[in-house]
């Protein structure tokens, strides 16, 4: 039972650890790669309501200088 709760909490943490990027992803999640990289995020996970979401990276998706 404890293992099930631990697994649930891990899944919940990963689903929350996404950052909303305002760039549109019409045409597929591959269009989110560049916006996520600019904000120093990991590769995008999915499109939600036509917008990109990215996993939080080491730099917590900080806006890069370029």
Curated annotation (Swiss-Prot):
Contains 4 disulfide bonds. One of its GO terms (cellular component) is extracellular region. Expressed by the venom gland. SUPFAM superfamilies: Scorpion toxin-like. It comes from the Eukaryota. It is found in: Secreted. InterPro entries: Scorpion_toxin-like_sf (IPR036574). Keywords: Disulfide bond, Secreted, Signal. Residues 1-17 form the signal peptide. Has the structural arrangement of an alpha-helix connected to antiparallel beta-sheets by disulfide bonds (CS-alpha/beta). Belongs to the short scorpion toxin superfamily. Potassium channel inhibitor family. Alpha-KTx 27 subfamily. This is Potassium channel toxin alpha-KTx 27.3. It comes from Lychas mucronatus.
